[in-house]
Amino acid sequence: MKKIVLATGNQGKVREMADLLSDFGFDVVAQSEFNVPEAAETGTTFIENAIIKARHAAQITGLPTIADDSGLEVDYLNGAPGIYSARYAGEHASDGDNLNKLLMAMQDVPDDQRSARFHCVLVLMRHADDPTPIVCHGKWEGKILTAPHGSNGFGYDPIFWVPEENCASAELEPVRKKQLSHRGKALQKLFKAIEEQRTC
């Protein structure tokens, strides 16, 4: 099994990514195990922030690194919270704080104007100076509920309605979420890209 560093401090992402990556033969080590401090997310896009995080962790650990930058884009809010999803309610906001702020912002918004999507950008940096990191994007369409449902997942999962399953993301079984989610889709693309490079 190939060791790879996961460049995030978000424990929900660590659990979900470790589970997804183990399916593809990777031994995932969280950056916290190497005492890697969080990188300053100074980018203006998911791609920029993912590259910043991946390069930062690769420089410190000397190992290949995968970084994930993801977020929720709500049409009614002109794409917010977007790249600020993890800190929508403030710099050290909890998942609950962010979720509640979003529910307040969407209060009284009609059902046909609650469309939203999750985005996930994954970057694989083979080493800190990798000139051609692998960049993959996954998207998951849904809408914002008026109240939380379910106890699985993390972040905005309890208020993200999944039309094809007729439930909230937080009500999905983990195996099904892997198949549908923005992160699962981005990982499928990432491993396809890795396989293609191995055969070049």
Curated annotation (Swiss-Prot):
<keyword id="KW-0479">Metal-binding</keyword>
<feature type="binding site">
    <location>
        <position position="69"/>
    </location>
    <ligand>
        <name>Mg(2+)</name>
    </ligand>
</feature>
<feature type="active site" description="Proton acceptor">
    <location>
        <position position="69"/>
    </location>
</feature>
<comment type="subunit">
    <text>Homodimer.</text>
</comment>
<keyword id="KW-0460">Magnesium</keyword>
<comment type="similarity">
    <text>Belongs to the HAM1 NTPase family.</text>
</comment>
<dbReference type="GO" id="GO:0005829">
    <property type="term" value="C:cytosol"/>
</dbReference>
<dbReference type="GO" id="GO:0017111">
    <property type="term" value="F:ribonucleoside triphosphate phosphatase activity"/>
</dbReference>
<dbReference type="GO" id="GO:0009143">
    <property type="term" value="P:nucleoside triphosphate catabolic process"/>
</dbReference>
<dbReference type="GO" id="GO:0000166">
    <property type="term" value="F:nucleotide binding"/>
</dbReference>
<keyword id="KW-0547">Nucleotide-binding</keyword>
<dbReference type="GO" id="GO:0046872">
    <property type="term" value="F:metal ion binding"/>
</dbReference>
<feature type="binding site">
    <location>
        <position position="177"/>
    </location>
    <ligand>
        <name>substrate</name>
    </ligand>
</feature>
<dbReference type="GO" id="GO:0009117">
    <property type="term" value="P:nucleotide metabolic process"/>
</dbReference>
<dbReference type="InterPro" id="IPR002637">
    <property type="entry name" value="RdgB/HAM1"/>
</dbReference>
<dbReference type="GO" id="GO:0036220">
    <property type="term" value="F:ITP diphosphatase activity"/>
</dbReference>
<dbReference type="GO" id="GO:0005737">
    <property type="term" value="C:cytoplasm"/>
</dbReference>
<dbReference type="InterPro" id="IPR029001">
    <property type="entry name" value="ITPase-like_fam"/>
</dbReference>
<keyword id="KW-0546">Nucleotide metabolism</keyword>
<dbReference type="GO" id="GO:0035870">
    <property type="term" value="F:dITP diphosphatase activity"/>
</dbReference>
<dbReference type="GO" id="GO:0036222">
    <property type="term" value="F:XTP diphosphatase activity"/>
</dbReference>
<protein>
    <recommendedName>
        <fullName>dITP/XTP pyrophosphatase</fullName>
        <ecNumber>3.6.1.66</ecNumber>
    </recommendedName>
</protein>
<feature type="binding site">
    <location>
        <begin position="8"/>
        <end position="13"/>
    </location>
    <ligand>
        <name>substrate</name>
    </ligand>
</feature>
<feature type="binding site">
    <location>
        <begin position="154"/>
        <end position="157"/>
    </location>
    <ligand>
        <name>substrate</name>
    </ligand>
</feature>
<dbReference type="Pfam" id="PF01725">
    <property type="entry name" value="Ham1p_like"/>
</dbReference>
<dbReference type="InterPro" id="IPR020922">
    <property type="entry name" value="dITP/XTP_pyrophosphatase"/>
</dbReference>
<comment type="function">
    <text>Pyrophosphatase that catalyzes the hydrolysis of nucleoside triphosphates to their monophosphate derivatives, with a high preference for the non-canonical purine nucleotides XTP (xanthosine triphosphate), dITP (deoxyinosine triphosphate) and ITP. Seems to function as a house-cleaning enzyme that removes non-canonical purine nucleotides from the nucleotide pool, thus preventing their incorporation into DNA/RNA and avoiding chromosomal lesions.</text>
</comment>
<dbReference type="GO" id="GO:0009146">
    <property type="term" value="P:purine nucleoside triphosphate catabolic process"/>
</dbReference>
<keyword id="KW-0378">Hydrolase</keyword>
<feature type="binding site">
    <location>
        <position position="70"/>
    </location>
    <ligand>
        <name>substrate</name>
    </ligand>
</feature>
<feature type="binding site">
    <location>
        <begin position="182"/>
        <end position="183"/>
    </location>
    <ligand>
        <name>substrate</name>
    </ligand>
</feature>
<dbReference type="GO" id="GO:0047429">
    <property type="term" value="F:nucleoside triphosphate diphosphatase activity"/>
</dbReference>
